[in-house]
Each structure stands twice: as C-alpha cells, then as structure tokens.
Amino acid sequence: MAIDEDKQKAISLAIKQIDKVFGKGALVRLGDKQVEKIDSISTGSLGLDLALGIGGVPKGRIIEIYGPESSGKTTLSLHIIAECQKNGGVCAFIDAEHALDVHYAKRLGVDTENLLVSQPDTGEQALEILETITRSGGIDLVVVDSVAALTPKAEIDGDMGDQHVGLQARLMSHALRKITGVLHKMNTTLIFINQIRMKIGMMGYGSPETTTGGNALKFYASVRIDIRRIAALKQNEQHIGNRAKVKVVKNKVAPPFREAEFDIMFGEGISKEGEIIDYGVKLDIVDKSGAWLSYQDKKLGQGRENAKALLKEDKALANEIILKIKESIGSNEEIMPLPDEPLEEME
C-alpha cells in the first residue's frame, strides 16, 4: 500500500533531523537496510551448536547459562571462550566468585596468557568494569561468573543480619538497561552464569525453581541455556565424568526449546568425540555392530571409550564425520534427538 506523498516528505525530513542529531542510521526503513546474518561463537559442543540454530551463541547479545551446582556452567563458558579465542577474539572473565581454575581453563583450550580476568570486590565494581571494557570496542566476549556473586556494596558494608530486599535485582536491572545497546553496537557477546534457587512458599503449578538476580536478565537475554547433570560416566568402576543435558529455554534468533546432550570428562571438559559417536550412530553415519563401532571401512574401536580415544588422535577423521553429520541434519531441520541412553551403560 502506497504512503501519502506528504507523509513521505514529513518522514524523510524527520529522518534527516534524527541523523543530524544522533548520527546516520539512527532511524532507517527496514526495507532499505540490508538484513545482516547473525554471527555466532561456537559453544565447543556439536549438539548445542545445532540446537542453538545458528551454530553457536549469537554475537552482540546477552546470554544466560544457568543450572544446579556442578552441572557444567563454567565449563561450557570456558569452552565458548576457547572457541572465540581460536578465531582471534579478545575475551574477558569477570570472576565475581573468585574461583577461576586457571589450570583447568588451560586444559580446555583457553589462552590464559591473553585472557583478561577481573576479581571484583562488589557487584557495582564488576558491572562498572564490564561497561568500561565493552564501551572500549576491543572485546568480543565477556563472561560474568556469577550473577549470585554480584553482591551490592551496601550488603557488603552492612552487618550480617541486615535485610537488603531487592537490592541485587535493582542493580542488575540498572546495569542491563545501560549495557544492552552498547553490546549490540560493539558486537560484544555477554554471558552471565547464574545459579538456581527454590521459590519460597511455592504451591500449585509451575516450576519451584528460579534464577538469582531478579527478572531483568530473563527479559534482556536473547538466549537462555539450562544445563543439568543427568548421569555419571564410569569406566572400570572409576568415575570419569558426567553426562549433561542442555535445553535452550529461550532463543530470540532461532526456534527455542531444542535440547542436546554431551559428556563432560573430568579434567578435559566437553567430549566432542562422544558427540560425534552419538550423532553418527543416530544418523547411520557410524555403524554399530555389537560393541564395535566403525565408519565406512575403518574400525573406530570396541566400545564407546575406545572409539572416542581413536577420534581424539585422528582429528582429520573426526572433522570428516562432523561434516557428514552437519550435512545430514541440515541447517533448517529440527535437531534429531539423541538416544535416551549413551552407547555404554551409565549410572
């Protein structure tokens, strides 16, 4: 439907005035603006990258990763840092919990020599540092670990029994209002790690769980990832890792509610090789005959752990199977669910 000529002139004049005051591009017609592809940073997990719909977490957006204790939240975040650094990105880690294990981060592939780290004393200090480095335009990814540890200064300075109702929620709300536009402009990804709490006096329907820091983060986050430990991985009765399940509970850049599963091995992080085997078997790319696993004419090994060890050594073969998996699934198809149980018995 054509717009009236007088209205067109009025709108054009208004756009010129806005461009003069706020800079060119402050107000544009969507039809005149080229639609940009959403860039992403890989999570280090094949299944989660596929579940997110764009190959990883979106750049220039706020991401929330939450779950129970020891579910793999920090591990997943460190993998994202490692993937960002592999592509020349500059990353920062705001360690509000004062619990960053540098040696573990290095084992996951993080370039710790070039990782910017801050261990702030208060929530205000953490968020001021976050805003300053983001506005610099030189940062590609910032991880805040965690929202629960962003303690307001008034709470730290007060006595142990003082009540500070809603103080942290107001702090988060104020910070997110200030930082969201800057993140988009600077194309900086911000990941908040968050913890779970139980709702007080929860009765009736709905989940009794909630995340810390109020509701602002739930609204401002473009992607929210729920990660849970679902099983223990054992080899010869030795506990060697955990099986994790992730659900994309909110996604503004692709369809939400997709899920993925992967192994988190102690001291090693996410097992890409385990995902290759799981998806390969599900998609009939990897053959499973009894305990033996094979790809085309090549034997991968007897049992899942042996096959994982071979793929870990043969990177070219692993990358070849990954390519086949991505081609088989296709970028526009629903993610195929993994088997209910991994290929070897777990407790």
Swiss-Prot record:
Family: Belongs to the RecA family.
Function recorded in the entry: Can catalyze the hydrolysis of ATP in the presence of single-stranded DNA, the ATP-dependent uptake of single-stranded DNA by duplex DNA, and the ATP-dependent hybridization of homologous single-stranded DNAs. It interacts with LexA causing its activation and leading to its autocatalytic cleavage.
Gene Ontology molecular-function annotations: ATP binding; ATP hydrolysis activity; ATP-dependent DNA damage sensor activity; damaged DNA binding; single-stranded DNA binding
Organism, scientific name: Helicobacter acinonychis (strain Sheeba)
Domain of life: Bacteria
Record-level GO BP terms: DNA recombination; DNA repair; SOS response
UniProt name for this protein: Protein RecA
Keyword Mitochondrion: no
Alphabetical list of SMART domains matching this protein: AAA (SM00382)
Keyword hit for DNA-binding: yes
GO cellular component terms, A-Z: cytosol
A Pfam family matched in the record: RecA_C
SUPFAM superfamilies to which the protein is assigned, alphabetical: P-loop containing nucleoside triphosphate hydrolases (SSF52540), RecA protein, C-terminal domain (SSF54752)
Localization, UniProt: Cytoplasm
Record-linked InterPro entries: AAA+_ATPase, DNA_recomb/repair_RecA, DNA_recomb/repair_RecA_CS, P-loop_NTPase, RecA-like_C, RecA-like_N, RecA_ATP-bd, RecA_C_sf
Binding site for ATP: G67, P68, E69, S70, S71, G72, K73, T74
Keyword terms, alphabetized: ATP-binding, Cytoplasm, DNA damage, DNA recombination, DNA repair, DNA-binding, Nucleotide-binding, SOS response
